[in-house]
From Swiss-Prot:
EC number: 6.1.1.17
Full protein name: Glutamate--tRNA ligase
Binding site for ATP: K256
GO molecular function: ATP binding; glutamate-tRNA ligase activity; tRNA binding; zinc ion binding
Short motif ('HIGH' region): ranges: 9-19
Encoding gene (name): gltX
Amino acid sequence: MSVVTRIAPSPTGDPHVGTAYIGLFNHTLAQQARARGEEGKFILRIEDTDRNRYVPDSERRIFQMMAWLGLTPDESPLQGGPNGPYRQSERTAIYGEYARKLVEAGHAYYAFETPEELAALREAAQQEGRVIAVPSRDLDPAEAQRRVDAGESAVIRLKVPREGETVVNDALRKPIAFQNREIDDKVLLKADGYPTYHLANVVDDHLMGVTHVIRAEEWITSTPIHVLLYRAFGWAEPIFAHMPLLRNADKSKISKRKNPTSVEWYMAQGFLPEAMLNFLATMGWTHPEGKEIFDLAEFQRVFRLEDVTLGGPVFSLDKLRWMNGKYLREVLSEEEVAERLHAYLASQKHDLPDDDYFRAVVRMMIPRMDVFSEFLEKTPYFWSEDYPVSEKAQHLIEEGRPFLPELAARLKNLPSFDPATTEAALRAFAEERGLKPGKVMQPLRAAIAGTSESPGMFELLEVLGQERVVARVERAARGG
């Protein structure tokens, strides 16, 4: 069976994690069809008909997000394809043609009400607890056509049946029945020739051969309109599956007020795309073997649409950070982490040499960071002598100042600076002074790193190197 899926984001702002989430499942269904030897196609089209909210750079950023995630579409405005154009703003003539076909068939009508008239009609309908009744619905079609031909401004509205019900079949739910009397006559084509979401969505999905409409559950209430349109055109309906919405911890719909929703924020923070995909895959779905860490290929191997659960999945930033840390420590090799961290730092305009010193610092920090943006925050003392000294570290330096000059001399005279040598020397130094080792090592750490928290002392000494360590201890001893 052919599987043709799509996502249709609107270029109205930041590329949203919700687009990535829905894109993952649509991409996966198409890939699974290919793996079975069937046709599988994933389409990305741009729904840019809301010109009031259009943001010029947003489309490029959507493509950038999809490329970062590795969810490459088979057809899109970028690479084209047999079903183009893929921007709705370039398809207005198509929508006008199909809207007029519905008028000719008696499934839609021209409506001439002014905004003021519509406001009054809506108020009356609200007071009476019913959907709006549009007078133009009862106009003689020939009279309506004459007015349009004369240049009068009109929209085209769907003529929803007055009686009966429209049933939505959803692959994740029991059939949902909507009473037709509670569905208003939606505008399909605006007076300026631009379509509404409902018409453009259905026409595009049909003409592009979409077989599966996988989208967020917020579109369920729009689906009876789409079902009525499919029936009015005489077209077969696709399979609908409405995915659970991503939620904040309080179960409210995810929003940037409570969680970063722009994928660009996660990119800038240094999250890995593999971890983001892994995390999004667990939103409403559980690996059949209980695995928490798995790659995209594994997800495509075991995912089944019918296994999606509908309880609102919580988008936990803490869980995503934990998962990203697992990738750094357990999935990627040290070499891969170093290479990708260096590329990330370069993208953030931090020019560090990719040398043995850099890689030694990376090796120490892998257990101590969850995302790449933490790397420089936690390692300023590796890259500059002008590193910050915390208040606690300053206090520790003051405590150790009586013995720091002698400690500097002892470290300076060591024949080597490997961990075994420095550990033995520091423990001997503490014992000679009748101190516990920590009473020596804590001021030393504060002096060479400006913090009371750092990687293991002896590894830290080796990576910083004897010359740098001695100079810093001498400076701290002088009170500098």
